[in-house]
Amino acid sequence: MSSIEDATVAPVTPSAPSPEVSERGIEYHRLALLRPRPRWWKPLLTGLLGIAFYLAILVLVIVPLVIVAALVPEWGAELQMLFRTTAYFQLDRPWLLVALVLPLILMIPALLLASRVVQGRGVGLLSSVTGRLRMDWLGRTLGLAFAVFVVYFAVVHGWSAAAGDAVTPDFSHPGLLLMVVLLLVLIPFQAAAEEYVFRGYLMQLVGSWLRHPAFAILLPVPLFVLGHGYDVWGAASVGLFAVVAAWLTWRTGGLEAAIALHIVNNLMIFLLGSVAVVDANATSGSPVDLLGSAAAMLVFAVVADRWARRRGITRTASPAAVARGTHLLPARMHG
């Protein structure tokens, strides 16, 4: 994801930083204030232009597929299934998974291009307060999330087995290997795309207008929940995930921990679904499911937060720190 960084910008030190910058630095949700010539309407215009770019990219991808489907009857029959099914995870039809996640992945170039066009240099500030995706911290939080969720799923399925439910994985499907490869390649980008939009762009959009982080953490949650077609318990779990991911983004000064949590959560569900241990197409949940997932997410959040403090992970951007990086700061930063 090196394209997320703005590596060609000459650093400029602001001449008159505001008290907010001088005393505490700028927190993640307020980073739009560090872009050149910040205006209240620029983040909003970024979103509108991003939607336009996104639709244009989708057209470029979809039109050739429709033409091929019209010329090849077998492809046409398969393509019709895309509009009839809600079960996108099928080992017999791995292309359905691609059709599900590829449009989400395409949000990344649309957002980054719109951000660069409207707000100018400093696109890397969508990643973190350092102006880049901190790969070492991302790797560490990936390991932490994996450890937490392995324990979580082991407890859940151990409990089910003790209650007499069959929890026998099935490795016999001939399409299993291809599906696993697709999951390992696509899901990290799908998870990152959602984080850049919902925890990156939307948090900084709200933060450019409202100072308190609670607004930036909570206001985007309904949009994230609406993007997932679950019942009330599933929606509650998704909403809690959104709050935890946003809180971690604010606390750690970047998207890395949220991306790690999202990647591992999705990968574990799909990988277990590949061997018939869970139903990866399920849209319903239960109070027990909600409590279990909440416990796993909260454990991850608490440990990641403490680990970040212990390792000295930067959570605010100061003029000096950003000037050493890749961002052009405006002459005056309004708090």
Please state what every model-predicted region is.
Residues L48, A154, P222-L223:
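Hydrophobic residues within the alpha-helical transmembrane core of Major Facilitator Superfamily
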Residues R39-G47, L96-L100, L104, W137, ...:
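Residue-level signature of transmembrane alpha-helical entry/exit and packing/kink sites
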Residues M1-G122, A282-G335:
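N-terminal, membrane-interfacial amphipathic/helix-forming hydrophobic leader that caps
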Residues A52-A56, L106, A147, I263-I269:
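Membrane-embedded alpha-helical segments of transport systems
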